């Protein structure tokens, strides 16, 4: 998230890797990366047009150099092990039996069959069984070199990471080849990046996903049972019918994987037409191929059964072609420096999806053609085109007064013909105060630069064809004679008036360096206003069941302050150190949502109850929940909580939670929801330090956030004692007349007061934290130890996520969803890994 979220659609930043546009850099080998820069203000990001409104991340990969024909070989090896940094405190068999039995006795029901005769039942800790120390391996080999006219870089990488949950694994193979040639006025080059990945992910199709299955599995569930189909234990009685955790990771029961091949290429040629003027042609094709498989065998887990084999296979293919024609001019005339850029770009993206499904496959034959029943298939495709004309001018006088202006015109096929094009201008001004004559005697000052800028950026990150009407087929209806007629109805109504989202950003900042560049400070204040946000606007049901159309209806404002304060010094040749503090304050507010009552709900629990809402006047994804006010400790308190002589909570008993009637209407319902906070922190920070003593080096990194809230949907599910799954150990501290300060209300199986209702603030927690993100200690071997063959060698140990200081009760307070309306929503999130690593870097 760069300077807050400015859209309710895709808020991911734009990645530029060596000039190639990418949606992410997950497939890039980190060992091949030379530098990463973040463009935040509109004036610097405007040249990239579409999606630059969410920030631009510039990634530059390594390249060759003139080594006079002698290759330089780099080898790196990293081995590590990861564990879950925290386990939740769950009930053991005795505690689970106590909680469920008391809850059921409260309504006159007997104990669960799986909660009796504990001496003859297992006491399984499913977190301990299903989580493991996970091995990580990373090997990289690169060769670079070149001569007078050409340079090259080739990198090979292999990464293998077991997941901390058994049965999960991720492998990636990388190759990069980068070649550059320059002679006289002509230069050309190629850059090829290929990756192949094989992923065995968590099962997410289950109740609460894989993590939810592990945590909800009861401790008396048998690991194995040879008498059942599949060979695993089963649940019975009045308990939740979730699949067996061990069976889920058994490929003979549930086999699934993702395979991805991604190919990115860049070919360029450049010629200097005359002094200072160059023409460059960039051709950037990229392709991705995905194959997904999910096989489900027959099994019997007691209450959860599957009597027929099932197979799903999916293939997806993406192709993107980017062509750029660029003219650049760069000249200096005395004390005047002028740079200019003009260009035209064309981007063509295509996607195709094919999926097949079948049931009744013979054992051992996992092919769609082998399915004997319920065969089905589906497929779809889309095409998107983006054309752009761009220009930029930079002027500098005496390196003191700086001016930059940019204009970009983007045309997107995602909009109708009348709104296809958007214009995005920007400008910036800079003043190098330290270069002025009146600063000549300020010897301790090395740099003082004041700058400011304004720019407009566009966003088109919505699905294709939203401006056009679409029809759903396959809808059958009776013909009056006992037969069926094929029919169709509108899926989406046409809206040719939708247009670009626009973000206008104003930025002022300062760059400061002093004391021989030892002290540095960069600070910025910004205001970021986004208008014409593309939203779905509800329409009446009488329209025929079509989806709500998209309109330009929303406005969002972000404003904040950022700084980077650093100090670095080298007191003597043997010692150097540095420290820097990075901080960001940001506030976001929704200005408009299309109508006075318009809103977008989010944070939906397993009971389909929403917990957050985006509405005008409040932050994005703000929590709207019913407040709680402790317990009713007596029947007199229940009776006294009334409106006009009627109980506000008529189903309540002593030990139940008291909910606040915020609107004073005598009823507890959704009208009593009030704003309870934001999932976005007020302050985000990182503190990094490094030190070198002779050949030893040490680096430490801390990070944290302050002021945000997290909705703990995991806790809400695991404290709901109305069902036969496992619960948090906190449920043992339940209310009784002798324990009125308990952390949990009275135990009751039917919960008529709805004590665990998801829409209450009981599960809203403080999300602030401080984490020791990384500690690395390294040693560089003296070159005198080697006789020419090895130029450089370093060994290091590294630890990540050693500890987190937080009051949050879940696995991790780092809860960040891609969807802004689910930010800060913890619904069985994956635990944070604690990793210990040993590494070796050698240069030949």
Per-region residue spans from a language model:
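Glycine-rich, aromatic-lined ligand/substrate-binding cores of catalytic
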Residues: 676-711
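Residues embedded in well-ordered regular secondary structure
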Residues: 1, 7-9, 13, 55, ...
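Short acidic/polar hinge/loop motifs at secondary-structure boundaries
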Residues: 18-46
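Conserved small-residue
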Residues: 74-121, 466, 568-678, 719, ...
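Extracellular/periplasmic, surface-exposed regions of secreted and cell-surface proteins
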Residues: 12, 137, 172-173, 178-196, ...
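Soluble periplasmic/extracytoplasmic beta-strand elements of cell-envelope proteins
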Residues: 1-3, 13-18, 35-39, 56-60, ...
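Extracytoplasmic gating/loop element in the C-terminal half of outer-membrane beta-barrel translocons
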Residues: 116, 127, 412, 705-800
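Short beta-strands and strand-coil junctions in structured, solvent-facing domains, enriched
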Residues: 8, 22-24, 42-47, 64-67, ...
């Amino acid at each position: 998230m760069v300077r807050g979220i400015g859209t309710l659609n895709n808020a991911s930043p734009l990645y530029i890797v060596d000039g190639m546009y990418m949606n992410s850099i997950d497939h890039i080998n980190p060992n091949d990366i030379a530098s990463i820069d973040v463009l935040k203000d509109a004036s610097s990001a405007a040249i990239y047009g579409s999606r630059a409104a969410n920030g631009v991340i510039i990634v530059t990969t390594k390249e060759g150099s003139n080594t006079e024909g002698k290759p330089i070989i780099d080898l790196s090896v990293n081995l590590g092990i990861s564990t879950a940094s925290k386990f939740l405190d769950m009930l053991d068999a005795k505690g689970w039996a106590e909680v469920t039995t008391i809850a059921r006795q409260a309504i006159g029901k007997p104990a669960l069959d799986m909660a009796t005769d504990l001496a003859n039942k297992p006491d399984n800790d499913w977190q301990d069984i299903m989580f493991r120390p996970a091995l990580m391996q990373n090997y990289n080999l690169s060769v670079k070199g070149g001569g007078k006219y050409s340079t090259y870089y080739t990198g090979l990488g292999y990464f293998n990471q077991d997941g901390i949950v058994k049965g999960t694994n991720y492998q990636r193979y990388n190759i990069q080849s980068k070649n550059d040639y320059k002679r006289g006025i002509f230069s050309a080059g190629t850059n090829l990046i290929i990756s192949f990945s094989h992923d065995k992910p968590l099962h997410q199709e289950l109740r609460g996903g894989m993590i939810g299955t592990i945590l909800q599995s009861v401790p008396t569930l048998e690991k194995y049972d040879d008498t059942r189909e599949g060979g695993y234990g089963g649940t019975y009685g009045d308990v939740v019918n979730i699949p067996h955790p061990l069976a889920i990771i058994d490929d003979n029961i549930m086999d699934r994987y993702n395979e991805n091949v991604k190919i990115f290429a860049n070919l360029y040629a450049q010629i200097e037409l005359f002094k200072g003027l160059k023409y460059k042609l960039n051709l950037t094709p990229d392709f991705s191929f995905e194959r997904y498989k999910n096989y489900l065998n027959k099994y019997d887990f007691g209450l959860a059964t599957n009597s027929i084999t099932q197979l799903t296979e999916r293939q997806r293919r993406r192709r993107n072609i980017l062509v750029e024609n660029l003219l650049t001019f760069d000249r200096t005339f005395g004390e005047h420096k002028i740079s200019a850029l003009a260009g035209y770009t064309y981007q063509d993206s295509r996607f195709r999806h094919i999926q097949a499904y079948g049931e009744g496959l013979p054992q051992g034959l996992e092919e769609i053609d082998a399915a004997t029943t319920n065969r089905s298939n589906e497929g779809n495709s889309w095409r998107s085109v983006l054309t752009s004309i761009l220009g930029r001018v930079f002027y500098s006088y005496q390196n003191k007064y700086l001016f930059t202006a940019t204009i970009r015109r983007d045309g997107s096929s995602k909009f109708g013909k009348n709104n296809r094009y958007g214009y995005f201008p920007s400008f910036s001004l800079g003043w190098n105060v330290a270069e002025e004559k009146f600063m000549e005697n300020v010897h301790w000052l090395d740099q003082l630069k004041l700058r400011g800028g304004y720019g407009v950026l566009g966003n088109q990150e919505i699905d294709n064809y939203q401006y056009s009407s679409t029809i759903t087929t396959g809808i059958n209806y009776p013909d009056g004679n006992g037969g069926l007629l094929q029919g169709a109805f509108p899926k989406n109504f046409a809206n040719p008036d939708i247009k670009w989202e626009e973000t206008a950003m104003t930025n002022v900042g300062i760059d400061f360096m002093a004391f021989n560049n030892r002290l540095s400070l960069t600070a910025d204040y910004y205001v970021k206003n986004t208008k014409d946000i593309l939203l779905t606007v509800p329409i009446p049901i009488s329209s025929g069941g079509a989806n709500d159309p998209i309109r330009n209806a929303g406005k969002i404002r972000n404003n904040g302050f950022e700084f980077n304060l650093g100090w670095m010094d080298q007191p003597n040749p043997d010692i150097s150190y540095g420290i820097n503090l990075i901080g960001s304050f940001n506030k976001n507010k929704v200005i408009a949502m299309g109508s006075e009552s318009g809103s977008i709900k989010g944070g939906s629990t397993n009971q389909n109850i929403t917990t957050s809402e985006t509405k005008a006047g409040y932050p994005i994804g703000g929590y709207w929940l019913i407040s709680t006010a402790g317990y009713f400790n007596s029947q007199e308190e229940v009776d006294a909580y009334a409106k006009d002589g009627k109980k506000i909570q008529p189903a309540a008993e002593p030990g139940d939670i008291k909910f606040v009637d915020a609107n004073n209407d005598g009823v507890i319902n959704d009208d009593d929801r009030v704003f309870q906070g934001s999932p976005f922190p007020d302050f985000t920070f990182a503190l990094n330090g490094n030190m070198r003593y002779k050949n030893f080096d040490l680096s430490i990194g801390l990070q944290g956030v302050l002021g945000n809230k997290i909705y703990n949907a995991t806790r809400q599910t695991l404290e709901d004692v109305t069902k036969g799954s496992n619960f948090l150990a906190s449920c043992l501290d339940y209310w009784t007349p002798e324990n009125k300060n308990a952390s949990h209300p009275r135990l009751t199986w039917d919960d008529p007061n709805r004590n665990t209702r998801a829409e209450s603030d009981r599960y809203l927690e403080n999300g602030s934290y401080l984490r020791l993100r990384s500690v690395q200690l390294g040693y560089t071997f003296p070159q005198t130890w080697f006789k020419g063959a090895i130029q450089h060698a370093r060994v290091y140990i590294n630890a990540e996520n050693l500890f987190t200081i937080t009051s949050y009760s879940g696995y991790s307070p780092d809860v960040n969803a891609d969807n802004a309306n689910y930010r800060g929503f913890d619904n069985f999130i994956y635990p944070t890994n604690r990793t210990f690593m040993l590494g070796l870097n050698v240069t030949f």
